[in-house]
Amino acid sequence: MLDTKPSATRRIPLVIATVAVGGLAGFAALYGLGLSRAPTGDPACRAAVATAQKIAPLAHGEVAALTMASAPLKLPDLAFEDADGKPKKLSDFRGKTLLVNLWATWCVPCRKEMPALDELQGKLSGPNFEVVAINIDTRDPEKPKTFLKEANLTRLGYFNDQKAKVFQDLKAIGRALGMPTSVLVDPQGCEIATIAGPAEWASEDALKLIRAATGKAAAAL
């Protein structure tokens, strides 16, 4: 009679392959590899995809982890508050290219990233660009303000969402897999690129890419 049971030696490669696949999945979840893409696109955001394609050659070095938009995607009109507790929405910034960043004081990579975001805001903010860093601490509302003050990060505007709904809203469309999360948004509120994890936003790599996204260097591409 033929032995139909797989031998131990034949099962070993299968086990190894299963472990390898599981390990890869965990790595992707931790570092945001393979951000889920929108199955259908918003026609109003086609220009943002064209911008993403145009600046894609600049996504290297310190910003190599950026995932460029491959389908038109309008971001939710994220709701949060400013430093005075007044309500703000993402749509309040229409007309500007934005780097929307979600951060928290309990997130070590977030805290390390904040000085670079502050420097980026100082170098490029203006009529065409702004960093919108939204804190999602849910307990002590003074803690993030104290952190920014003690770190002498004075150029960033202060925005917060104590319910952390902005994170859930981005997670619902596959754009928030961990912290920090940053989305480069065009003047119409459409995704250009997304990164899960920190980046050196004050680096020359980042500055060149963002200048290109705002149109200042598009002609050079």
UniProtKB/Swiss-Prot annotation:
UniProt entry tagged with the keyword Disulfide bond: yes
Cell compartment(s), UniProt: Cell membrane
Principal localisation: membrane
Cysteine disulfide partners in this protein: 45-190, 107-110
Topology with respect to the bilayer: Single-pass type II membrane protein
Record bears the keyword Membrane: yes
Residue numbers on the Cytoplasmic membrane side: 1-11
Domain of life where this protein originates: Bacteria
TM spans (from-to): 12-35
Residues annotated as domain Thioredoxin: 69-215
Gene Ontology CC annotations of this record: plasma membrane
GO MF term list: disulfide oxidoreductase activity
Function: Involved in cytochrome aa3 assembly.
NCBIfam families: ThlDiSintTplARhiz (NF047696)
Known partners and oligomeric status: Monomer.
Family: Belongs to the thioredoxin family.
Protein name, per record: Thiol:disulfide interchange protein TlpA
Organism listed in the record: Bradyrhizobium diazoefficiens (strain JCM 10833 / BCRC 13528 / IAM 13628 / NBRC 14792 / USDA 110)
Classification of source organism: Bacteria, Pseudomonadati, Pseudomonadota, Alphaproteobacteria, Hyphomicrobiales
Gene field: tlpA
